[in-house]
Amino acid sequence: MPREIITLQVGQCGNQIGMEFWKQLCLEHGISKDGILEDFATQGGDRKDVFFYQADDQHYIPRALLIDLEPRVINGIQNGDYRNLYNHENIFVADHGGGAGNNWASGYHQGKGVEEEIMDMIDREADGSDSLEGFVLCHSIAGGTGSGMGSYLLETLNDRYSKKLVQTYSVFPNQMETSDVVVQPYNSLLTLKRLTLNADCVVVLDNTALGRIAVERLHLTNPTFAQTNSLVSTVMSASTTTLRYPGYMNNDLVGLLASLIPTPRCHFLMTGYTPLTVERQANVIRKTTVLDVMRRLLQTKNIMVSSYARNKEASQAKYISILNIIQGEVDPTQVHESLQRIRERKLVNFIEWGPASIQVALSKKSPYVQTAHRVSGLMLASHTSIRHLFSKCLSQYDKLRKKQAFLDNYRKFPMFADNDLSEFDESRDIIESLVDEYKACESPDYIKWGMEDPEQLMTGEGNASGVVDPKLAF
């Protein structure tokens, strides 16, 4: 029986990457732009109903909600090639259409105002599922709608569907360049608090690294948003491939995440993908082997998290867990030999308090999508260097807060009324504690970390270190 997943696309960025994801899924399952199964799609063996359901006339509809506070991106989808794919009852655009003005507080407050309408949509989708496993949220953490309204939805889902998994694909801003959004550090910090407390798994999509990969690996001089979004959709579709083409293991979300996330708060994952190609390179074919793919996945240049985070204090940084999803016709003995070679050459530095092994899931490729390579791979990994990404968010926040800059934008909303800025302080404490926990993971004594300090043991929304999240327990 399929375990269904409902996708929530929130804000401009969330809807853009969500749109690319559905395009990719339609290609892989042989579904047309109108949701009709193509005549050539006769092979079967795939689980379309994890992400799609069928209407009365048998055409496929995504289990997706498209949510935004301003209409531009959703209007583009409704007038585009895939306009007949979605259920139009599951599209929400705010009546005023004014957006959130890149202000987290505005997005959060407006989310509260339309909670009933959006939760009705979610409840309807959930009721239409036979065995709902969880939710996937696509959003950005830097703007207003994806961060603020996304945060409110995370809290609400955690409350309403407490036993269901919540995974996010969260786009982190380019922290190495000056942003158009001056309040980006505030928005990012407030969203990170919710991602820490209310999500079970966060796949970090770092704009800095996506841009670098597009330039260095795909040889694009000035990569467009469409091209970086295409990279994101590749990661999203590859990370769900074992759910859609099930094998013996990792064929549901809980199985996928349980092995990757040994402690509840360290649930931020980085990704790597190889080989990457663009259309004009498709005629350049090289030999791909399992060992070649698995070695490349460990190279910093293929990791979709900023190199400054990966390289800072690199000698101390360690992998907490790795899952490689290998797609293609692969002999399991090749996997075993590749793992042995990687172990012999000590290419991976694991934590000392957990199992020091790379897990591998083998998955079929879609028979309907022709690629130039025989084997491709996605790495999902928990790595302690991710803390430098959060530290950067903290330092950028501290600079703004020290100057008391732009806080009036937030004081207009109830959460920050009467100059009550405790939400900022609490968010900062939680993210600082998260950074400390990732640092502690590098120590062999991590299992004892926090036990002697009762204040660090989280209650209610979070869990203490070392406690297995009940949603991820078998």
UniProtKB/Swiss-Prot annotation:
Signal peptide region: none
Subcellular location: Cytoplasm, Cytoskeleton, Microtubule organizing center; Cytoplasm; Nucleus; Cytoplasm, Cell cortex
Binding site for GTP: A142, G143, G144, T145, G146, S147, G148
Keyword check for DNA-binding: no
Keywords linked to the UniProt accession: Cytoplasm, Cytoskeleton, GTP-binding, Microtubule, Nucleotide-binding, Nucleus
PROSITE patterns reported for this sequence: TUBULIN
Signals that turn on the gene: Up-regulated in galls upon nematode infection.
SUPFAM superfamilies registered for this protein in UniProt: Tubulin C-terminal domain-like, Tubulin nucleotide-binding domain-like
GO cellular component, one term: cell cortex
A Pfam entry, by short name: Tubulin
Inactivation phenotype: Alteration of the morphology of feeding site and failure of nematode life cycle completion.
PANTHER family referenced in this protein's UniProt entry, alphabetically: TUBULIN
Similarity comment: family membership: Belongs to the tubulin family.
Role played: Tubulin is the major constituent of microtubules. The gamma chain is found at microtubule organizing centers (MTOC) such as the spindle poles, suggesting that it is involved in the minus-end nucleation of microtubule assembly.
Protein name as annotated: Tubulin gamma-1 chain
Protein species of origin: Arabidopsis thaliana (Mouse-ear cress)
